[in-house]
């Protein structure tokens, strides 16, 4: 539940009234929030049609109130991450996928800005290099998994191998897989086996203490166009745009179908996908932060305790310090 009693911990009441411009009672009535993230979770075996799912938020929560809520959630994430790091027996892997310009980089920056860098690592996966092509498609992703006690973020991931490679199957030929030396041989059985490999990989991680959550930022084609134009028009954003972005944009529908099948085949109870409306960046960031916060809380993390003998030693050490001359 989101009310003044919670955000007062972050922002003084005087500043809240100034920013939001409504009374305390009106705020509670207007902005009471239940956990919204469940509606964006893809149930195992569920059919997915992206064109029927929202790309924007049209609810009552206003941007400034949402930002205040996010600050509260980030404090909770930070506390949970401290416990995760201290306990050192579990890890969290967060996967981000999206069409170009959906806001993956900025979402990662905003959601994880409050965590201790020692306990968090981010990997951005680009086109595989020669060494990576010489191994199976999961090899480079396995090498980038978070250690116990850490949060790992994969900006793009092993799913590129059933997304980009599905739209451009000629890329599969670079993997030198026996029996697949021609695009015409890459059939439905090939993709089915690849989905199964991904599910087995993620289940293996789960079985060994790594919780996996997968985020898809669902951007509309119209909003992508506007963001591309912003990158072209703003000199400080020119570096973000490449001509190849328009080539991939022409394959929009092919990518939508590839994503839909990936969600249907790989969203499981233990490793779910979340399809988050991304046209409004502030809302997408809030939902992602809540998903991360909820997931960490579900792990029921605690700071490690000490044995009786260790506690006795602490008492001795305390006495020694206090008696120092």
Residue ranges, per PLM feature:
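Charged, amphipathic alpha-helical linker segments immediately N-terminal to NTP-binding catalytic cores
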Residues: 27-74
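Glycine-rich phosphate-binding P-loop
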Residues: 96-111
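A glycine- and Lys/Arg-enriched "phosphate-lid" helix/loop adjacent to the NTP-binding pocket
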Residues: 166-195, 205-257, 304-311
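Conserved nucleotide-sensing/catalytic segment adjacent to the nucleotide-binding pocket
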Residues: 62-64, 120-125, 130-186
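NTP-dependent small-molecule kinase module
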Residues: 251, 255-260, 264-325
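Pre-Walker A adenine-sensing motif
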Residues: 78-85
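Conserved nucleotide-binding/hydrolysis micro-motifs of P-loop NTPases
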Residues: 101, 128-131, 157-161, 169, ...
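Pre-Walker A (Motif I) flank of P-loop NTPase domains
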Residues: 88-93, 149, 271-272
């Amino acid at each position: 539940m989101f009310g003044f009693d919670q955000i007062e911990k972050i922002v003084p009441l005087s500043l809240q009234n100034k920013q939001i411009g409504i009374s305390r009672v009106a705020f509670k009535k207007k902005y009471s929030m239940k956990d919204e993230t469940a509606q964006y979770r893809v149930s195992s075996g569920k059919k997915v049609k992206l064109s029927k799912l929202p790309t924007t938020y049209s609810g009552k929560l206003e941007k400034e109130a949402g930002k205040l809520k996010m600050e509260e959630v980030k404090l909770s994430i930070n506390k949970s991450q401290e416990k995760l790091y201290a306990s050192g027996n579990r890890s969290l892997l967060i996967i981000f996928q999206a069409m170009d310009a959906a806001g993956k980089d900025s979402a990662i920056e905003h959601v994880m800005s409050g965590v201790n860098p020692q306990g968090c690592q981010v990997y951005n996966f680009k086109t595989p290099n020669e060494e990576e092509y010489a191994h199976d498609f999961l090899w480079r992703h396995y090498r980038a998994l978070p250690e116990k006690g850490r949060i790992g973020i994969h900006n793009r991931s092993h799913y590129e191998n059933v997304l980009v490679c599905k739209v451009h199957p000629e890329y599969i030929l670079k993997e030198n897989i026996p029996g697949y030396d021609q695009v015409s041989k890459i059939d439905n059985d090939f993709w089915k086996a690849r989905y199964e490999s991904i599910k087995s990989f993620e289940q293996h991680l789960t079985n060994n203490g790594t919780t996996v959550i997968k985020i898809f930022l669902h951007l509309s084609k119209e909003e992508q166009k506007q963001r591309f134009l912003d990158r072209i028009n703003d000199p400080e954003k020119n570096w973000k745009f490449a001509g190849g972005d328009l080539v991939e944009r022409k394959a929009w529908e092919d990518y939508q179908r590839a994503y839909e099948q990936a969600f249907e085949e790989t969203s499981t109870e233990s490793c779910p996908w979340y399809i988050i409306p991304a046209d409004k960046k502030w809302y997408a960031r809030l939902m992602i932060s809540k998903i991360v916060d909820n997931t960490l809380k579900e792990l029921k993390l605690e700071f490690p305790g000490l044995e009786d003998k260790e506690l006795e030693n602490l008492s001795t050490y305390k006495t020694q310090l206090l008696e120092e001359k």
